[in-house]
Structures are given as C-alpha cells and as structure tokens.
Regions:
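Bacterial N-terminal signal peptides
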Residues: 15-27
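Post-cleavage N-terminal segment of exported redox proteins
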Residues: 3, 28-31
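Bacterial N-terminal signal peptides that target proteins for export
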Residues: 2-17
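Catalytic Cys-His active-site segments of thiol-dependent hydrolases/isopeptidases
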Residues: 423
C-alpha cells in the first residue's frame, strides 16, 4: 500500500487556495506579534505645568499633546533621574541610575562607551534606530576630570566624535541643538556621509523634519526614534508662526516659551499624522517627557536674547522648586504614553513612574527578555490593568542633595544632615515637613537612601557642602538656612 504523508492533505488545491486566502485576509502570522515601533520624545527644561492636559495654568496651548494624553495615558507622578540635562538623559537612555556609570552631574560626562543604550538593546530584535536633536552625552568644556584623565588640555573634534550617537547604537542621527547638526542623512531622507550640516530655520521645526524623514524611509519598521527637542531651553526664540495674540500681555520670556512649546506640540501632531498615513499609528509605542523641571531664576523677565542661563519661561506649578533641585519642581515632569489599541485610552495614572522605566518597557514591548541590570520596571502590565506597582523606592543624588520616594512618602536631604519628609500625595507643594512627627518613616527612608548610595560611584551621601545656588534655593523654597561653601 502506498504510504500517504501526514502533511500531504494541506497541499490539496483547495487547501492551498484556503491558505492563500487566509494569508491575504489575516496577513502573515508574524505580523500579529510584530514588535512595535518605539518613539521617545524628550523636551528640554519643560516644566510640569506646561501641557494643557495638566490643568495647572490657563495660558498653555498644546492640543496635540492633550489629544495624545486622551488617547493614551497621563502619568501624574512621572520622574526623571536627575534635575539636570546630561545625567537625566544618561539615566533615561541606559535605563540605569546614571551614578552606576559614575555620573552625578554634567562635569562627570561623557557617557561611557561601554554603557548599553536602548538603541543597543533593541538591535537584536531587528530595530533600526535614529537619534535626533540634543545629545549632550559627549565630552564638553566642563568635563575637566575626564580631560585630565585622558591627558587632554583642550578638546578637539577627534576627542568628541567617538562619543556621538553612532558609538551608542544609533544607525541614523541628526544630532544638534539649533543651527548646526552632525548627520548621516538629509531632511529628504536620503543617506549622506557623516558630517556637519548648517540649518537656518527654527530648531524645533528642523528636529521634527529630521524625525519625519527617518520614519518616511523606514515604514516597515521596527524602528526606534529618540527625538530630543531643544525647547523651551534658553536661548529662547519666539517664532511668529507659533505666537498667539492672546499672549501679548504676558512676560516676554513666557511668550517665547509658549511659542516654542506650541512648536513642539505642532511637531508631535505632524508625527501623529505621518504615522497614521503610513498605517503605523496602532503599532507604535510613544513616550513624551522632559529632561528635568523648568529653571525659574526668580522669573526674571530679561530680553530673550540675553541671560542664556536664566528663566526659560516655563512653569512648574503647582510644584515646589526648580531645575537643579531634588524638590518636586526639579524632578517631576510631564510624562505621557500612547500605544493605540494596546494601552488604555484616557487613563490618568497616579503611581510614581520614572524615565528609568522607558528602557525596561521598550525591552518588553520588543519581545526581549528582562534584563536584571535595568533599574526600571516594565510598565505595560501595570498600565494595561490600571494597577499600582509592587511597592518600590525611587532614588536621587545630585550636588549635595539626596532623595527617595516610596509610595506617598518622600525623603529629602541636603548638605550635612538637613532632612525633610513629605507626604507627596497630600502635599505635592512640599510645604509641610513631617520629619519630626514621623521619625520611623524618616529613619526607614534615610536607611534605604543610604543603602542605595552604597551601590554607586562614588558611594555614600554627598560630602560636598551646598553650592551657592543650593544655599539660595533652600531658604527660598523650604524656609531653611543651610551653610553654603566656605
């Protein structure tokens, strides 16, 4: 008797027709579980107040970001890992406390080349990655310690270029802040030899165009876009296309910031339109946040073409403090997530989350196994269920300050033992120091914070005295005199 192969029936003409029909109706099996595209949008010095959906101030206009929140998730307790640009970006991009890499502040840069970034983690899952806008993880004029260790008296291009995005896993890049960009593709999407490109147009529009150009050339994905808007950071600009007549009586710096934020919002809207046009909007996970809170500097309204280190016109309302502080206004920022059809729409999530969680969440979304080196957590199962995470503590160390948040409680330490304890859920403005009335809670969080600092480089609570800025800020925001530098 002729043997019949057990799979032969599927090759019957009618079976083949059915398989072909199913292929075109349902698509290939792999497509159902195709990893999502991932976009991380980081603004620069954007304060907690400055999205319309936050409901904190009346003058802000961000319709596209508000729509993103309504179609996704707004995290009301979103934190960065530092109240300053470079260390915050190092923590976000690696998913690890940046102090594990020896970075407490900007002078501790550059990001070590052996640090593993989100782009490098996603590469084994087939992702193509692009970095756009502000990088700020390379050596610069204040990284004196690194320069001394490497025998460098004055930085030259050959000292800096090895620390650009290509060295950290990015296949494509349009790196720059304002008028000059280091790029390996053009704004029409065509590849080019790596080199410097001058741009005369408004920086936010250029950075949006660079993101759109990359996405347009990679419609099949999966891709990872790390889009870093240099806004509303100083030096401020007030592009007429984004100014609104209703702002004319506001401080000049506030007007400029509002117009720059409107430009970011417009860019986010353009990205959404492009994703929809390419049929990618339901398979793209998007994060939106800031690198730290707004620098307020007493709200001094100097002309926008002066005082580059002053107030950037943004606001942290209703939070206490500003950029450079481990007060809420320095480290708590806008934090949105969207993944249409996957994450709930219109959710307000109140449990603390961190930019550390972006790497772990991206890892999980890409189908990669958990990495025990990551300090963040995968937010997807929590957000899908609307559940709080198992109790965890978030930590910070910056200048002479240390902080920890566990649940509703926050510990803050500055200098040699000035301590504060706040119930952040009840007191987001950090007005009521409960250190004296809650000694057990104070002791617990202090011990946790100290144990965490023992894992860092260098270990322990900061030993340096408060710097002149801290010596001004803590009396101003907390009503406590602290000793500054001798």
């Amino acid at each position: 008797m002729k043997k019949t192969h057990r799979f032969s029936s599927i090759f019957h003409p009618r079976s083949l027709c059915l398989l072909i029909l199913l292929f075109f109706v349902c698509g290939p099996v792999a497509a159902a579980s195709a990893p999502p595209n991932i976009i991380v949008i980081v603004t620069d010095d954007l304060g907690y107040a400055d999205l319309g959906v936050q409901g904190a101030v009346e003058d802000i206009r961000t319709p596209n970001l508000d729509a993103m929140a309504k179609e996704g998730i707004r995290c009301t307790s979103g934190y960065v890992t530092a109240p300053q640009c470079s260390p915050s970006r190092a923590g976000l991009l690696t998913g690890r406390y940046q102090q594990r890499l020896g970075i407490d502040q900007i002078p501790d840069m550059p990001l070590p080349l052996n640090a593993v970034t989100i782009a490098e983690r996603l590469r084994p899952a087939g992702y193509t990655s692009a970095m756009i806008g502000k990088w700020h993880l390379e050596p610069n004029e204040v990284t004196r310690k690194w320069m001394q260790e490497n025998g460098i008296e004055k930085l030259a291009p050959q000292d800096v270029l090895p620390f650009f995005p290509a060295a950290q896993g990015f296949d494509f890049y349009y790196k720059g802040e304002s008028k000059r960009y280091y790029a390996n593709y053009s704004l029409d999407g065509t590849p080019r030899e790596p080199g410097w490109v001058n741009q005369s147009r408004f920086r936010v529009d250029v950075q949006t165009d660079a993101a759109l150009a990359f996405i347009g050339q990679h419609p099949k994905g999966p891709f990872f876009v790390y889009l870093n808007y240099f806004a509303p950071h100083t030096p401020l600009e007030a592009p007429p296309a984004y100014l609104k007549p209703e702002w004319k009586n506001l401080p000049l710096r506030r007007q400029a910031a509002l117009s720059m934020i409107a430009a970011v919002d417009h860019g986010v809207g353009r990205l959404g339109e492009r994703l929809s046009a390419l049929g990618l909007d339901k398979n793209t996970l998007i994060f939106f946040t800031s690198d730290n809170g707004a620098p307020l500097h007493g709200f001094r309204d100097s002309p926008i073409n002066t005082d580059a280190g002053g107030w950037d016109g943004s606001l942290n309302t209703p939070l206490n403090g500003e950029k450079g502080m481990l007060a809420e206004g320095g480290i708590r920022v806008p934090f949105l997530m969207q993944w249409k059809g996957k994450l709930p729409a219109g959710m307000t999530y109140q449990a603390p989350v961190s930019t550390l969680d972006i790497a772990a969440t991206a890892n999980a979304a890409a189908g990669l196994p958990p990495d025990p080196q990551l300090d963040g957590i995968n937010l997807l199962p929590l957000l899908e269920a609307g559940a709080k995470p198992a109790e965890r503590t978030l930590f910070w160390r910056f200048w002479s300050q240390t902080a920890a948040r566990e649940g509703d409680w926050k510990y803050l330490r500055v200098g040699d033992g000035h301590e504060f304890l706040f119930n952040i859920q009840d007191d987001p403005g950090e007005k009521n120091n409960l250190a004296a009335s809650q000694p057990a809670k104070l002791d617990r969080l202090r011990a946790q914070a100290f144990a965490w600092t023992q894992e860092l480089t260098p270990p322990g609570f900061p030993t340096r005295p408060p710097n002149p800025q801290e010596a001004v800020w803590f009396p101003q925001y907390f009503g406590v005199e602290i000793d500054g530098p001798p």
